[in-house]
């Protein structure tokens, strides 16, 4: 890589040094540009032309670019190829006299932190996982241990902690394995989860022993962090800070040091990759298309500790041989159990069904409650079909609300959220009708107290969120722009001052002309004129 010779390339190199492992999308006007090796890699993946900068000076710099307004599609392709992407935005509006605008990385998107509509599969979770090992767990392979002074060194059984989060839905869970089968149980759980990215303490390996053939296709990107990130005391502190609690008893993490360490590493990493960028509201206003997500982890408001044995344990060999969610050979997904029974109407339902298949329920009461609820709806064909039709027009509320919280929602995402929430009252009414019909003729529907309780709880727990619907309806225009910073986002009448400012921008010439006429009359100077140039802005000229 040649030494940068221009202020722009010096700025690029300074930013790139901060994110050496990511493909850097560097905003230049209406394009995101990539340079040097990043450009070579991206051009092959995106199938775009690789050009060069400064060829005439004998210092050709490979480069390629993508339009900023279509960046999400290109970013999705880079993420699916297993790369991390750092987005470097212009933090100032280019203007006269500015030789170079300030630029900063506002967000780092990785395979495990992707949350955009085009970045993740609608019917699958996009998990980011972390694995923490105590002293003695996987030491033979050089695995780094978290929690100084803990583990086998003092006679405590070595343990492996696993935590995982789906940033696009808010699901956040953790577990822990111990004993001589801990490594095998970790492999089984990762085989079920299929995370896109796994965090490890440097210089640990994911599997400290030989990897079984059935795990070859895990395909997760391995990201190594400093080992202090997995230190248990630090992890507990960062989790307490994130959840705004004094202790972690309410989350079931007490006594599970490695699960705590893994969960803390996840929160640390999410802060590192998301809490980047605009330093002030003024900065945020400059870059509305890709606002930073650092203040947007509030939807991760709880973590659930679970034991693997709470559901039927399926190892990777069983999942593969039974073709539960993926075909054992080839790419024909129609051969799987999931495809055979999946008639879900929403992405949320599809992900739930997939999870149920991979973690079969073993609690008799829960199994019977599900079956009874199914029996009720099966006996009511009309109600069932109406519920299905209503669900079909409800978009992915989990991911829409997550995008809002992350600060990356577009104006049209907000309209989609409003439209989906407007269907909730009708859905609640349909559930209430189904409950009444089942109760009026229990012999026909096979209704039991358990089944009716399940439909009843669904009816009661559905929040119609009328205040959110009303806020969006009053505030967002019916046909908003694709980008938040473009004119026409806020509905006229929502804010009088904003309406006045819009009028000024639209009727600027008329306003200046009227002001000029008023000043002529007030001063009695007929030659008074209001002029503008790029050096002084608006000024009064008297000749």
What annotation goes with each model-predicted range?
Residues 380-381:
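Short intracellular "coupling" helices and adjacent cytoplasmic loop segments at the cytosolic face
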Residues 348, 522, 542:
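Residue-level signal for short amphipathic helical patches enriched in basic/charged
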Residues 510-530:
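Flexible, glycine/threonine-enriched loop-and-boundary segments that flank and lead into catalytic domains
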Residues 202, 532, 542-543:
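Active-site proximal loops enriched in glycine and acidic residues that flank catalytic Cys/His/Asp
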């Amino acid at each position: 890589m040649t030494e940068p010779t221009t202020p722009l390339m010096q700025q690029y190199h300074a930013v790139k040094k901060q994110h050496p492992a990511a493909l850097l999308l560097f905003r230049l006007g209406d394009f995101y540009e990539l340079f040097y090796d990043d450009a070579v890699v991206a051009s092959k993946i995106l199938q775009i032309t690789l050009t060069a900068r400064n060829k005439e000076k004998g210092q050709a710099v490979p480069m390629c670019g993508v339009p900023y307004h279509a960046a999400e599609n290109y970013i999705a392709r880079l993420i699916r190829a297993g790369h991390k992407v750092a987005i470097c935005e212009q933090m100032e509006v280019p203007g006269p006299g500015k030789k170079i605008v300030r630029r900063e990385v506002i967000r780092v998107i990785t395979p495990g932190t992707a949350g955009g509509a085009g970045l993740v599969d609608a019917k699958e979770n996009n998990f980011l996982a972390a694995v923490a090992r105590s002293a003695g767990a996987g030491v033979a392979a050089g695995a780094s241990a978290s929690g100084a002074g803990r583990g086998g060194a003092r006679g405590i059984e070595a343990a492996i902690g696993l935590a995982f989060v789906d940033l696009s839905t808010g699901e956040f869970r953790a577990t822990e394995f111990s004993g001589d089968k801990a490594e095998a149980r970790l492999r089984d759980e990762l085989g079920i989860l299929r995370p896109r990215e796994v965090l490890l303490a440097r210089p640990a390996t994911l599997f400290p022993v030989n990897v079984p053939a059935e795990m070859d296709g895990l395909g997760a990107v391995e990201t190594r962090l400093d080992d202090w990130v997995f230190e248990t005391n630090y992890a507990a502190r960062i989790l307490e800070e994130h959840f705004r609690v004094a202790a972690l008893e309410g989350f079931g993490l007490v006594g599970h040091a490695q699960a705590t360490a893994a969960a803390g590493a996840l929160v640390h990493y999410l802060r590192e990759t998301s809490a980047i960028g605009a330093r002030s509201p003024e900065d945020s206003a400059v870059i509305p298309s890709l606002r930073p997500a650092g203040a947007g982890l509030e939807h991760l408001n709880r973590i659930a500790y679970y034991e693997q044995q709470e559901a039927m344990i399926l190892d990777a060999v069983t999942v593969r041989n039974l073709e539960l969610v993926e075909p054992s050979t080839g790419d024909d997904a129609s051969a799987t159990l999931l495809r055979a029974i999946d008639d879900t109407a929403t992405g949320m339902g599809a992900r739930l069904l997939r999870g149920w298949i991979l973690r079969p329920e073993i609690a008799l009461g829960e199994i019977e409650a599900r079956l009874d609820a199914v029996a009720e709806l099966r006996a009511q064909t009309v109600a069932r079909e109406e519920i299905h039709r209503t669900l079909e027009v409800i978009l992915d509320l989990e991911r829409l609300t997550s995008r809002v919280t992350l600060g990356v929602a577009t104006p049209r995402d907000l309209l989609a959220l409003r439209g989906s929430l407007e269907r909730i009252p009708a859905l609640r009414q349909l559930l209430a009708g189904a409950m009444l019909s089942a109760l009026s003729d229990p012999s026909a529907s096979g209704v039991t107290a358990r089944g009716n309780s399940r439909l009843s709880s669904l009816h009661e727990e559905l929040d119609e969120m009328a205040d959110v619907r009303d806020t969006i309806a009053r505030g967002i225009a019916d046909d908003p722009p694709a980008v938040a910073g473009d004119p026409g986002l806020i509905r006229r009448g929502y804010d009088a001052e904003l309406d006045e400012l819009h009028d000024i921008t639209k009727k600027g010439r008329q306003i200046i002309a009227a002001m000029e006429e008023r000043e002529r009359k007030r001063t009695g100077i007929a030659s008074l004129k209001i002029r503008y140039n790029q050096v002084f802005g608006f000024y009064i000229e008297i000749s």
